[in-house]
Design a protein with these regions (language model features):
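Short helix-coil boundary/hinge micro-motifs
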Residues: 1-226, 256-257, 263-280, 284-287, ...
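Short loop/turn segments at secondary-structure transitions that flank enzyme active sites
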Residues: 224, 242, 253
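Cysteine-rich micro-motifs
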Residues: 230-250
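Extracellular/mature segments of secreted proteins
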Residues: 244-245, 255-257
Protein backbone atom coordinates (compact mmCIF):
# COMPACT_ATOMS: atom_id res chain seq x y z
CA UNK A 1 0.00 0.00 0.00
CA UNK A 2 1.40 3.40 -1.00
CA UNK A 3 2.28 5.96 1.65
CA UNK A 4 3.29 9.59 2.06
CA UNK A 5 4.73 10.18 5.53
CA UNK A 6 5.41 13.55 7.12
CA UNK A 7 6.88 14.32 10.52
CA UNK A 8 8.71 17.07 12.39
CA UNK A 9 12.05 16.86 14.17
CA UNK A 10 13.07 20.02 16.04
CA UNK A 11 13.61 22.67 13.33
CA UNK A 12 13.15 20.24 10.42
CA UNK A 13 10.29 18.61 8.56
CA UNK A 14 10.74 15.31 6.77
CA UNK A 15 8.80 13.56 4.00
CA UNK A 16 9.01 9.93 2.91
CA UNK A 17 7.00 8.56 -0.01
CA UNK A 18 6.77 5.16 -1.67
CA UNK A 19 4.29 3.91 -4.27
CA UNK A 20 4.93 0.27 -3.32
CA UNK A 21 4.52 0.82 0.41
CA UNK A 22 7.98 -0.47 1.33
CA UNK A 23 8.94 0.91 4.75
CA UNK A 24 12.54 1.81 5.52
CA UNK A 25 13.61 2.37 1.90
CA UNK A 26 11.22 5.03 0.53
CA UNK A 27 11.57 6.09 -3.10
CA UNK A 28 11.42 9.72 -1.92
CA UNK A 29 13.16 10.93 1.26
CA UNK A 30 13.25 14.73 1.59
CA UNK A 31 14.15 17.13 4.40
CA UNK A 32 13.29 20.82 4.70
CA UNK A 33 13.50 23.53 7.37
CA UNK A 34 10.42 23.55 9.61
CA UNK A 35 7.28 24.84 7.80
CA UNK A 36 9.11 25.27 4.47
CA UNK A 37 6.65 23.02 2.61
CA UNK A 38 3.65 25.08 3.72
CA UNK A 39 5.37 28.41 3.02
CA UNK A 40 6.44 27.40 -0.49
CA UNK A 41 2.92 26.09 -1.12
CA UNK A 42 1.55 29.49 -0.11
CA UNK A 43 3.95 31.16 -2.56
CA UNK A 44 3.28 28.74 -5.44
CA UNK A 45 1.57 30.01 -8.59
CA UNK A 46 -1.32 27.54 -8.74
CA UNK A 47 -2.56 29.10 -11.97
CA UNK A 48 0.40 27.52 -13.76
CA UNK A 49 -0.77 24.08 -12.65
CA UNK A 50 -4.32 24.41 -14.00
CA UNK A 51 -3.68 23.42 -17.67
CA UNK A 52 -1.38 20.59 -16.57
CA UNK A 53 -3.97 19.16 -14.17
CA UNK A 54 -6.68 19.50 -16.83
CA UNK A 55 -4.59 17.47 -19.30
CA UNK A 56 -3.92 14.81 -16.68
CA UNK A 57 -7.63 14.62 -15.85
CA UNK A 58 -8.56 14.24 -19.53
CA UNK A 59 -6.05 11.40 -19.97
CA UNK A 60 -7.20 9.69 -16.79
CA UNK A 61 -10.76 9.93 -18.08
CA UNK A 62 -9.78 8.20 -21.34
CA UNK A 63 -8.00 5.51 -19.37
CA UNK A 64 -10.99 4.58 -17.22
CA UNK A 65 -13.58 5.03 -19.99
CA UNK A 66 -11.76 3.30 -22.86
CA UNK A 67 -8.93 1.48 -21.07
CA UNK A 68 -6.52 3.61 -23.11
CA UNK A 69 -3.23 2.54 -21.51
CA UNK A 70 -1.27 5.07 -23.57
CA UNK A 71 -3.40 7.86 -22.13
CA UNK A 72 -2.76 6.46 -18.65
CA UNK A 73 0.98 6.36 -19.28
CA UNK A 74 0.91 9.96 -20.52
CA UNK A 75 -0.98 10.98 -17.37
CA UNK A 76 1.66 9.32 -15.19
CA UNK A 77 4.50 11.00 -17.11
CA UNK A 78 2.91 14.41 -16.50
CA UNK A 79 2.33 13.60 -12.84
CA UNK A 80 6.00 12.63 -12.60
CA UNK A 81 6.99 16.02 -13.99
CA UNK A 82 4.46 17.83 -11.82
CA UNK A 83 5.79 16.40 -8.56
CA UNK A 84 9.10 18.24 -9.00
CA UNK A 85 7.27 21.54 -8.46
CA UNK A 86 6.36 20.89 -4.84
CA UNK A 87 6.64 18.13 -2.25
CA UNK A 88 2.84 18.12 -1.74
CA UNK A 89 2.42 17.04 -5.37
CA UNK A 90 4.43 13.87 -4.68
CA UNK A 91 1.22 12.56 -3.13
CA UNK A 92 -0.59 12.74 -6.47
CA UNK A 93 2.12 10.77 -8.23
CA UNK A 94 2.40 8.08 -5.54
CA UNK A 95 -1.34 7.58 -5.22
CA UNK A 96 -2.07 7.56 -8.97
CA UNK A 97 0.91 5.29 -9.67
CA UNK A 98 -0.46 2.78 -7.18
CA UNK A 99 -3.90 2.83 -8.80
CA UNK A 100 -2.51 2.67 -12.35
CA UNK A 101 -0.43 -0.39 -11.39
CA UNK A 102 -3.38 -2.18 -9.78
CA UNK A 103 -5.55 -1.40 -12.78
CA UNK A 104 -3.00 -3.10 -15.03
CA UNK A 105 -2.89 -6.18 -12.80
CA UNK A 106 -6.60 -6.65 -12.08
CA UNK A 107 -8.19 -4.92 -15.08
CA UNK A 108 -10.74 -3.26 -12.79
CA UNK A 109 -10.93 0.12 -14.52
CA UNK A 110 -13.96 2.32 -14.06
CA UNK A 111 -14.39 1.59 -10.36
CA UNK A 112 -15.86 4.07 -7.91
CA UNK A 113 -12.30 4.79 -6.79
CA UNK A 114 -11.33 5.77 -10.35
CA UNK A 115 -14.30 8.12 -10.67
CA UNK A 116 -13.48 9.70 -7.33
CA UNK A 117 -9.85 10.25 -8.36
CA UNK A 118 -11.01 11.80 -11.64
CA UNK A 119 -13.30 14.18 -9.77
CA UNK A 120 -10.42 15.13 -7.46
CA UNK A 121 -8.20 15.95 -10.44
CA UNK A 122 -10.87 18.15 -12.00
CA UNK A 123 -11.51 19.97 -8.72
CA UNK A 124 -7.88 20.34 -7.68
CA UNK A 125 -7.02 23.67 -9.42
CA UNK A 126 -9.86 25.41 -7.62
CA UNK A 127 -9.15 23.60 -4.36
CA UNK A 128 -5.46 24.57 -4.33
CA UNK A 129 -6.37 28.25 -4.66
CA UNK A 130 -8.90 27.85 -1.85
CA UNK A 131 -6.32 26.23 0.43
CA UNK A 132 -3.90 29.08 -0.22
CA UNK A 133 -6.53 31.67 0.74
CA UNK A 134 -7.44 29.71 3.88
CA UNK A 135 -3.81 29.41 4.97
CA UNK A 136 -3.24 33.12 4.40
CA UNK A 137 -6.32 33.91 6.50
CA UNK A 138 -5.07 31.59 9.23
CA UNK A 139 -1.75 33.42 9.24
CA UNK A 140 -3.52 36.78 9.47
CA UNK A 141 -5.75 35.80 12.39
CA UNK A 142 -3.70 33.21 14.29
CA UNK A 143 0.00 32.87 13.42
CA UNK A 144 1.29 36.24 12.15
CA UNK A 145 3.01 37.77 15.17
CA UNK A 146 2.57 41.31 13.81
CA UNK A 147 -1.18 41.04 13.14
CA UNK A 148 -2.32 38.36 15.60
CA UNK A 149 0.16 38.62 18.47
CA UNK A 150 2.46 36.13 20.14
CA UNK A 151 -0.03 33.54 21.42
CA UNK A 152 -1.31 31.21 18.64
CA UNK A 153 -3.19 29.07 21.17
CA UNK A 154 -5.20 32.04 22.37
CA UNK A 155 -5.93 33.25 18.83
CA UNK A 156 -6.93 29.79 17.62
CA UNK A 157 -9.30 29.38 20.57
CA UNK A 158 -10.82 32.77 19.78
CA UNK A 159 -11.34 32.02 16.08
CA UNK A 160 -12.75 28.47 16.31
CA UNK A 161 -15.90 27.09 17.91
CA UNK A 162 -15.38 23.39 18.64
CA UNK A 163 -14.12 22.03 15.29
CA UNK A 164 -15.49 24.83 13.09
CA UNK A 165 -13.94 28.20 12.21
CA UNK A 166 -15.98 31.25 13.15
CA UNK A 167 -14.77 32.86 9.92
CA UNK A 168 -15.76 30.66 6.93
CA UNK A 169 -12.64 31.81 5.06
CA UNK A 170 -10.40 30.15 7.68
CA UNK A 171 -8.87 26.71 7.26
CA UNK A 172 -11.13 23.95 8.61
CA UNK A 173 -9.40 21.27 10.66
CA UNK A 174 -10.49 17.64 10.32
CA UNK A 175 -9.29 14.31 11.74
CA UNK A 176 -5.99 13.33 10.14
CA UNK A 177 -4.28 9.88 10.04
CA UNK A 178 -1.54 10.22 12.67
CA UNK A 179 0.66 7.35 13.81
CA UNK A 180 3.45 7.22 16.40
CA UNK A 181 6.65 5.40 15.52
CA UNK A 182 10.47 5.45 15.61
CA UNK A 183 11.78 8.06 13.18
CA UNK A 184 15.43 8.34 14.22
CA UNK A 185 17.76 6.20 16.36
CA UNK A 186 16.42 6.34 19.90
CA UNK A 187 13.55 8.69 19.08
CA UNK A 188 9.83 8.29 18.33
CA UNK A 189 7.52 10.95 16.94
CA UNK A 190 3.97 11.49 15.68
CA UNK A 191 3.92 10.70 11.95
CA UNK A 192 1.28 11.81 9.47
CA UNK A 193 0.28 9.20 6.87
CA UNK A 194 -1.18 11.71 4.46
CA UNK A 195 -4.16 10.79 2.31
CA UNK A 196 -4.54 14.25 0.75
CA UNK A 197 -2.87 17.64 0.39
CA UNK A 198 -5.16 19.20 3.06
CA UNK A 199 -3.82 16.62 5.54
CA UNK A 200 -0.31 18.06 5.19
CA UNK A 201 -1.53 21.65 5.45
CA UNK A 202 -3.59 20.71 8.51
CA UNK A 203 -0.64 19.01 10.25
CA UNK A 204 1.64 22.01 9.68
CA UNK A 205 -0.88 24.55 10.98
CA UNK A 206 -1.90 22.59 14.07
CA UNK A 207 1.76 21.89 14.88
CA UNK A 208 2.49 25.63 14.88
CA UNK A 209 -0.39 26.25 17.28
CA UNK A 210 0.57 23.34 19.56
CA UNK A 211 4.21 24.45 19.70
CA UNK A 212 3.41 28.16 19.99
CA UNK A 213 5.30 29.00 16.80
CA UNK A 214 4.42 32.28 15.08
CA UNK A 215 5.33 33.54 11.61
CA UNK A 216 6.48 36.92 10.33
CA UNK A 217 7.27 38.50 6.99
CA UNK A 218 11.00 38.93 6.50
CA UNK A 219 12.18 42.54 6.57
CA UNK A 220 14.49 41.82 3.62
CA UNK A 221 12.72 39.48 1.16
CA UNK A 222 9.11 39.90 2.31
CA UNK A 223 8.47 36.16 2.59
CA UNK A 224 7.01 34.50 5.67
CA UNK A 225 9.30 32.61 8.03
CA UNK A 226 8.61 30.61 11.22
CA UNK A 227 9.91 32.09 14.44
CA UNK A 228 11.46 28.94 15.84
CA UNK A 229 14.07 30.97 17.72
CA UNK A 230 13.76 34.56 18.94
CA UNK A 231 10.27 36.04 18.52
CA UNK A 232 11.93 39.40 17.86
CA UNK A 233 13.71 38.07 14.74
CA UNK A 234 13.03 40.25 11.68
CA UNK A 235 15.10 38.44 9.04
CA UNK A 236 14.54 34.90 7.76
CA UNK A 237 16.85 31.96 7.19
CA UNK A 238 14.79 30.55 4.32
CA UNK A 239 16.76 28.52 1.77
CA UNK A 240 18.63 30.56 -0.87
CA UNK A 241 20.65 29.53 -3.95
CA UNK A 242 24.11 28.17 -3.18
CA UNK A 243 26.64 30.93 -2.61
CA UNK A 244 24.09 33.57 -1.58
CA UNK A 245 23.63 34.97 1.91
CA UNK A 246 20.48 34.23 3.86
CA UNK A 247 18.37 37.26 4.71
CA UNK A 248 19.44 36.92 8.34
CA UNK A 249 23.10 37.12 7.36
CA UNK A 250 22.46 40.05 5.02
CA UNK A 251 20.26 41.76 7.60
CA UNK A 252 22.89 41.48 10.31
CA UNK A 253 25.42 43.16 8.01
CA UNK A 254 22.93 45.91 7.10
CA UNK A 255 22.21 46.55 10.77
CA UNK A 256 25.93 46.70 11.56
CA UNK A 257 26.56 49.07 8.64
CA UNK A 258 23.70 51.35 9.71
CA UNK A 259 24.88 51.36 13.30
CA UNK A 260 28.42 52.23 12.24
CA UNK A 261 27.27 54.96 9.84
CA UNK A 262 25.43 56.63 12.73
CA UNK A 263 28.42 56.33 15.10
CA UNK A 264 30.51 59.56 15.21
CA UNK A 265 33.53 57.70 16.62
CA UNK A 266 33.51 55.19 13.76
CA UNK A 267 32.94 57.98 11.21
CA UNK A 268 35.97 59.88 12.49
CA UNK A 269 38.12 56.74 12.37
CA UNK A 270 36.85 55.78 8.91
CA UNK A 271 37.53 59.24 7.47
CA UNK A 272 41.14 59.25 8.66
CA UNK A 273 41.59 55.60 7.63
CA UNK A 274 40.54 56.32 4.02
CA UNK A 275 42.79 59.38 3.83
CA UNK A 276 45.86 57.49 5.01
CA UNK A 277 45.07 54.46 2.84
CA UNK A 278 45.20 56.78 -0.18
CA UNK A 279 48.65 57.89 0.94
CA UNK A 280 49.95 54.38 0.19
CA UNK A 281 49.23 54.80 -3.54
CA UNK A 282 50.68 58.30 -3.44
CA UNK A 283 53.89 56.98 -1.89
CA UNK A 284 53.56 59.15 1.22
CA UNK A 285 53.45 56.16 3.58
CA UNK A 286 54.55 52.53 3.47
CA UNK A 287 52.25 49.55 3.96
CA UNK A 288 54.02 48.68 7.20
CA UNK A 289 53.62 52.18 8.64
CA UNK A 290 49.95 52.34 7.58
CA UNK A 291 48.99 49.07 9.25
CA UNK A 292 50.93 50.00 12.38
CA UNK A 293 49.01 53.30 12.51
CA UNK A 294 45.64 51.58 11.93
CA UNK A 295 46.35 49.22 14.84
CA UNK A 296 47.05 52.16 17.17
CA UNK A 297 43.96 53.99 15.82
CA UNK A 298 41.73 51.01 16.63
CA UNK A 299 43.10 50.82 20.16
CA UNK A 300 42.39 54.52 20.67
CA UNK A 301 38.89 54.01 19.21
CA UNK A 302 38.21 51.33 21.81
CA UNK A 303 39.19 53.81 24.53
CA UNK A 304 36.79 56.36 23.06
CA UNK A 305 34.01 53.75 22.86
CA UNK A 306 34.56 53.05 26.57
CA UNK A 307 34.58 56.80 27.40
CA UNK A 308 38.19 56.66 28.57
CA UNK A 309 38.84 59.60 26.22
CA UNK A 310 36.36 62.02 24.65
CA UNK A 311 35.41 62.16 20.97
CA UNK A 312 37.22 65.50 20.67
CA UNK A 313 40.39 63.99 22.13
CA UNK A 314 40.16 61.04 19.74
CA UNK A 315 39.68 63.31 16.70
CA UNK A 316 42.66 65.40 17.81
CA UNK A 317 44.77 62.26 18.19
CA UNK A 318 43.80 61.09 14.68
CA UNK A 319 44.90 64.41 13.17
CA UNK A 320 48.25 64.47 14.92
CA UNK A 321 49.14 60.75 14.93
Amino acid sequence: MWYVKMYFSEKRELFQCDASGIQGVPSVDREFPFLESLLTFLEMDCGELTPILQRIADRWSRLIAEFDRDAGTEAMVELGQLKSRHIYLELLYVRWYDRFSRMGIYGDRGSAEDEQMLAELRDLPEQLLLYQKQVQRFFDLVLDVDSAGRDPQQQAAKNYLHDSPRDPSLFRFRPIPLSFEPVEPGRCSPVLYSASIPDMIDYSLRSCVERGITVRRCKNCGRYFPQTGRVSAEYCERPVPRGQQTCREAGAFQQWTKKQSDDPVFKAYRKEYKKRFAWIKAGRISDTDFYAWSERAREMKKKCDRDVITLEEYVEWLKNS
